[in-house]
């Protein structure tokens, strides 16, 4: 990770986050880039929770967080005009973290599974114009067989 990421959470919750990060790195073999992105997403979530709860999040807060809390987070992110692809990754991060908490028997909260990813625009490949097509054909004729 590039620089230390701080989490607005109790020491106990921060220890869970570090264990989850180690699990992602060691057992799931996530790249450092992915781990960094997931860690930053989780930091943003805990920053939101601090404002939402008016204090640093604790274990029982994570266990009792309902669908409305998760949707409030997504609404706050959407209000800041966060790209839908980034929102989808943040939801994926939260699902992954809460699933790990459940599997590790730390706490159970399945409300995140109700949240659906935002619809992302489907971008079709752009067609080549006539000049580009002829240039491509000329280049392929120049290549020799293996």
Language model features: what each stretch is:
Residues 1-146:
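Conserved catalytic core of the tyrosine transesterase superfamily
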């Amino acid at each position: 990770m590039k620089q230390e990421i701080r989490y607005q959470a109790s020491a106990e919750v921060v220890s869970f986050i570090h264990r989850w990060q180690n699990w992602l790195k060691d057992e799931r073999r996530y790249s450092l880039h992915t781990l960094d992105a997931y860690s930053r997403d989780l930091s943003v979530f805990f920053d939101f929770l601090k404002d939402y709860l008016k204090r640093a999040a604790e274990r029982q807060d994570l266990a009792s967080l309902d669908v409305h809390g998760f949707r409030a987070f997504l609404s706050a992110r959407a209000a800041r005009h966060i790209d839908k692809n980034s929102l989808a990754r943040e939801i994926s991060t939260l699902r992954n973290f809460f699933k790990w908490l459940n599997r590790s028997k730390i706490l159970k909260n399945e409300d995140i599974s109700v949240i659906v990813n935002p619809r992302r625009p489907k971008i079709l490949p752009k067609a080549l114009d006539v000049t580009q097509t002829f240039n491509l054909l000329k280049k392929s004729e120049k290549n020799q067989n293996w």
